[in-house]
A protein has these predicted regions:
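Residue(s) in the substrate-gating loop at a strand-loop-helix junction
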Residues: 151
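Canonical Rossmann dinucleotide-binding motif of NAD(H)/NADP(H)-dependent dehydrogenases/reductases
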Residues: 12-44
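Conserved glycine-rich Rossmann-like NAD(P)H-binding loop of the short-chain dehydrogenase/reductase
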Residues: 41-53
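Substrate-binding pocket helix/loop in short-chain dehydrogenase/reductase
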Residues: 106-107, 111-119, 215
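Active-site helix of classical SDR
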Residues: 130, 167, 175
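C-terminal substrate-recognition "lid" of short-chain dehydrogenase/reductases
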Residues: 223-252, 256-257
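Alpha-helical segment proximal to the catalytic Tyr-Lys
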Residues: 135, 180-184, 243
Length: 259
C-alpha cells in the first residue's frame, strides 16, 4: 500500500496523535507513556491501578494524560471504556497493549482460575483492544499503529511461569497474525520483547545477588534495563518512521537474547 500523504519533516513527531496505553500505572508501561508524550502524543491511560503517578510524569514533560479506570480481564468494561475514550477524544491513532500480570507457581499446582486470569489480562485483552483499534483505524481510513508488549518468554520456556509463558507466546503469534490481516489497511502491528527490566515486579530478583548475578553476566550491556529505556523504541514504532515495519518483535534486552 503506497503512502499517499506527504511525509512530515520530523519522522518521529506524534503531535496531534492520541495514544491508548494499557497497563501504564508503573514500570514499562509508564516509560512507554512518558516517551510517547515527549514526542507530542496525548496519552489515554488504561489501567485498573492508580494512574496518578503516570499522569504527573507525563505532565512533567509537557504532555497531556487522560485517565481511564478499567479491568482488562473484563471484556464488557473494555468495550465500555474504549467507546468512552473515542467519544471524548474523537480519534485514536496508536494502541499500546502493555497490560500484564504474572504468577509464579509449579505447573503441578498452578490454579486454573489464576491461569485463566493471566491469559485474560495478558492476551485476550490485547486481542479485544486490537480488534477495536483496527476497526476504528479502518473506519477513519488512517494508518494506525498497534504495538504489543511481548517478552523473552515469547520464545523461552521459563520455570514456574506456565501461564505467563503461554500468554506471551500467544502475544507474538497474535502480533504476526494481526500484521498479516491489517497490512492491506495500512495498519502496522509490532511487538516489543523486554528483557530483564527493573520494576516493582522484578525488584526481588534484582535485589537477590544469587539470582541477579548470572543475569547480569549474560547481558552484554552489563546492566538491567529501566522503564525509560523504552521511550525511544516506543516513539519509533508509533511514528511514521516505522511505516514499512510490521509483524516484527524487537528485543529490548541489552543483548540478552543475542548471547
Amino acid at each position: 500500500m503506497q503512502r499517499k500523504e506527504e511525509k512530515k519533516t520530523n519522522l518521529f513527531s506524534l503531535e496531534g496523535k492520541n495514544a491508548v496505553v494499557t497497563g501504564c500505572a508503573t514500570g514499562i508501561g509508564q516509560g512507554l507513556a512518558v516517551g510517547l508524550a515527549k514526542a507530542g502524543a496525548k496519552i489515554l491511560a488504561f489501567d485498573i491501578a492508580d494512574l496518578s503517578e503516570t499522569k504527573q510524569k507525563v505532565e512533567e514533560v509537557g504532555g497531556e494524560c487522560q485517565l481511564y479506570h478499567v479491568d482488562l480481564s473484563n471484556s464488557a468494561m473494555i468495550d465500555e471504556i474504549w467507546h468512552l475514550a473515542v467519544e471524548e477524544n474523537q480519534h485514536i491513532d496508536i494502541l499500546f497493549n502493555n497490560a500484564g500480570m504474572q504468577h509464579r507457581e509449579s505447573v503441578l499446582t498452578y490454579p486454573e482460575d489464576v491461569f485463566d486470569r493471566v491469559i485474560a489480562v495478558n492476551l485476550k485483552s490485547a486481542f479485544l483492544m486490537a480488534q477495536k483499534a483496527a476497526n476504528h483505524f479502518k473506519e477513519r481510513g488512517c494508518r494506525g499503529k498497534i504495538i504489543n508488549t511481548a517478552s523473552l518468554f515469547s520464545t523461552f520456556g521459563g520455570v514456574d511461569v506456565s501461564g505467563y509463558t503461554c500468554s506471551k507466546g500467544g502475544m507474538l503469534s497474535l502480533t504476526r497474525a494481526l500484521s498479516n490481516e491489517l497490512a492491506p489497511y495500512g495498519i502496522c502491528v509490532n511487538a516489543l520483547a523486554p528483557g530483564y527490566i527493573l520494576t516493582e515486579l522484578t525488584r526481588a530478583v534484582y535485589n537477590n545477588p544469587e539470582k541477579s548475578r548470572p543475569i547480569n553476566e549474560r547481558i552484554p550491556m552489563g546492566r538491567w534495563g529501566n522503564p525509560d529505556d523504552f521511550e525511544g523504541i516506543a516513539v519509533f514504532l508509533a511514528s511514521q518512521a516505522s511505516d514499512y515495519i510490521t509483524g516484527a518483535m524487537i528485543p529490548v534486552d541489552g543483548g540478552y537474547t543475542a548471547r
